[in-house]
Amino acid sequence: MKQTWRWYGPNDPVTLSDVRQAGATGVVTALHHIPNGEIWSVDEIQKRKAIVEEAGLEWSVVESVPIHEDIKTHTGQYDLWIKNYQQTLRNLAQCGIYTVCYNFMPVLDWTRTDLEYVLPDGSKALRFDQIEFAAFELHILKRPGAEADYTAEEIAQAERRFATMSEEDKARLTRNIIAGLPGAEEGYTLDQFRQHLATYKDIDKAKLREHFAYFLKAIIPVAYEVGVRMAVHPDDPPRPILGLPRIVSTIEDMQWMVETVNSMANGFTMCTGSYGVRADNDLVDMIKQFGPRIYFTHLRSTLREENPKTFHEAAHLHGDVDMYEVVKAIVEEEHRRKAEGSDDLIPMRPDHGHQMLDDLKKKTNPGYSAIGRLKGLAEVRGVELAIQRAFFSK
C-alpha cells in the first residue's frame, strides 16, 4: 500500500513536515478555499501541488472534489456544475493527479454526535450516539415525521436524554451535527439546515439514484478519457438519517454503481470505518469482489455499542473491523495487479485517530490530530509488513 496522510492545506495544524516524519510519502488534500461547484484552475492546482512537493511529498489523492447540492437534487444549475466538475477533472489530470475521492451524501457529510468521547485510557474519540441523535432530531430540529425512524424505546430514551441536557449540551450537540466536520464543505444554522432538508422532501432512494446515475454518466466518460480514477466514499453512517436517503452503504449499492456505468474509471474508496459500522457489511468480501476498482482506502475501526446504531471510533487494530484480514485482502489485490503487469499500489491513509498524549493540549481537527493517526499508520504498516513477509516474500 502507498502510505498517505490527509492534509487540510496550509491552515492545518498538522504540517507537511509532520506528515513526512510520520513516514507517509503521499498527501491527500483538496482545494477547500474554492467554493463548491467552481472549477479548480490549473494554476490553483499547481500551487497546491508545488507546496506538497517542496516538502518532499507527492499529492497522491484528491479528497474531495465536492459535488454541488444542485446535482444531488437535480435542480437549479446542475448541468453547469457538472460541466465545471468535468473541467476540474481535466485540469487535475493535466497536473498529473489521477485519483479523486468524492461522496454523494445529501446535505451532510460524515456525522457524529460527540467529538470528545473520553475513552478509559483518557484519550478522546469520535462517537455517534443513536439516542442523542434522536434527541436532536425529535426535540431540537423537530423534523416532521421523524418518529417513524425510531423505535418506541429509542423515542422514550431520547425524551429522557433531552430532559437532562443543559442549554450548552443542546448547543454543542447541534453544532456537532450541522456545523460541518473536517472535510465537509457545508455548515449550517438550524434554520438553514431545515431549509436544505426540505429540498429533499420528494427525493427517495430511487430518485437519488437517478440523480447519481445522471452524474456518473456525465462524469465517468470524461474521467476515463483523461485517466482519472473516481473513488466514491461510502455514506457515514451507512444508513438513512434525517429522512435523507443514502445510496452508497452496502455491497448491493456498489454493484448498482458498476452496473449503472461499467467503466474502470468508476471505482471505490474502501473506508472500513464507514462500511464497517454495519454488521451486515463483509469488508473482506467487498474487497475481493470489487478489488480491481478499489483505488483508495481509509483504514480505521469502529465499535458498535449496546444499541447497534451507536458506535465510537476504536483503535485501528481493535473494534469490529478485522484489520488483519482487510489489509491482507488489499495486499492480495495489489499482488494480483502486479502479476498482470501493473505496479499500481493502492493509496492508504490512517483514518480518524484518537486525540491523545500531547495532542490533548492542542486545538485539532476532530478525528485528524497527529499522534493518533501516527499510531494508526505505524500499526497498519506493521500489519502489512508481516503479511508481505509471511505470504509474499521469496
UniProtKB/Swiss-Prot annotation:
Keyword Manganese among record annotations: yes
NCBIfam families: PRK03906.1, uxuA
An individual GO BP term: D-glucuronate catabolic process
EC number(s) stated in the UniProt entry for this protein: 4.2.1.8
Family in the record: Belongs to the mannonate dehydratase family.
One function term, GO molecular function aspect: mannonate dehydratase activity
Reactions catalysed: D-mannonate = 2-dehydro-3-deoxy-D-gluconate + H2O
Cofactor: Fe(2+); Mn(2+)
Metabolic or biological pathway: Carbohydrate metabolism; pentose and glucuronate interconversion
Entry superkingdom: Bacteria
Cross-referenced Pfam families: UxuA (PF03786)
Function (record text): Catalyzes the dehydration of D-mannonate.
The keyword Iron is assigned to this record: yes
Name recorded for this polypeptide: Mannonate dehydratase
Record key words, sorted: Iron, Lyase, Manganese
Enzyme class per UniProt: lyase
UniProt cross-references to HAMAP family, sorted A to Z: UxuA (MF_00106)
